[in-house]
Amino acid sequence: MNTNDFDFELPEELIAQTPLEKRDSSKLLIIDHRQKTMVDSHFDHIIDQLNPGDALVMNNTRVLPARLYGEKPDTHGHVELLLLKNTQGDQWEVLAKPAKRLKVGSQVNFGNGHLKATIIDELEHGGRIVEFSYDGIFLEVLESLGEMPLPPYIHEKLEDAERYQTVYAKENGSAAAPTAGLHFTTDLLKKIEAKGVHLVYLTLHVGLGTFRPVSVDNLDEHDMHSEFYSLSEEAAQTLRDVKQAGGRVVAVGTTSIRTLETIGSKFQGDIQADSGWTNIFIKPGYQFKVVDAFSTNFHLPKSTLVMLVSAFAGRDFVLEAYRHAVDEKYRFFSFGDAMFVN
């Protein structure tokens, strides 16, 4: 298939720049790809789409304040580092600006020298491996000096950084939020659990590759980014029990889908505790092995995420749903509205 097969018209004013005051007051488009139906609703009604005995699977990753602004001690030139992933110990893969000034051995100071980075390797596209030195606990230093790395299409400053975290965010490590989860409130989750739905958590640390556009025409030539995931034995057992009892596995967001389908593909449809790196690219033609339904936000034209939704619900129907969302002025992308896909 061709990348342009997943294009659609999106007026810029529909790209949400700020979150709504109440997380669960966003709109929800409920689609059923078998019945070919679409229903306009609100997110707090997602509970009506869940049955007792289902499992609702959420990604509990937490976004790091991963954008650091510092300077080179020799020239006082300004430097920006964006932390991508922890490679080992105090070493991180980062995206550096301006990268050409940062050769192996270069140093960068942050916060009057409370945090220092030494370049130990050069990668392509402005990537660097750095080693940090600091006093105390790294995450606490990062919390005090770093800024939240908002997506490139959001131009307004975020008043409350916690609004770019899910209410169940726990495991530090993401460069971006698993945005389908931003709609849930603690109260809504309690109501869902009280209905007899199992709340299950996994972890996938979202990388910046999630925003990287597809640069090839032929999808078979696309090089998918890798992200770290983990599913505990307790979570895997719950999901196996749910499946065995005839319940559904309902994923919250594409990161949960990619984790579950990575594991399902690895273990021939079985759900096992597992951790590792995944670069699974789910596109039309893929046979789903674990996920029965899911919620997700509205994604960028020609993105791998639109392709993933199309793999589940069919390209033509998904693009029809997106046209409906545009006509009805749904809000798009990270702080936007949601879709529930049966």
UniProtKB/Swiss-Prot annotation:
UniProt pathway annotation: tRNA modification; tRNA-queuosine biosynthesis
GO molecular function annotations of the record: S-adenosylmethionine:tRNA ribosyltransferase-isomerase activity
GO BP terms, alphabetized: queuosine biosynthetic process; tRNA wobble guanine modification
InterPro entries xref list: QueA, QueA_dom1, QueA_dom2, QueA_sf
Main EC class the enzyme belongs to: transferase
Transferase is among the record's keywords: yes
Keyword Transcription recorded: no
Record-stated family: Belongs to the QueA family.
Subunit structure: Monomer.
Protein name: S-adenosylmethionine:tRNA ribosyltransferase-isomerase
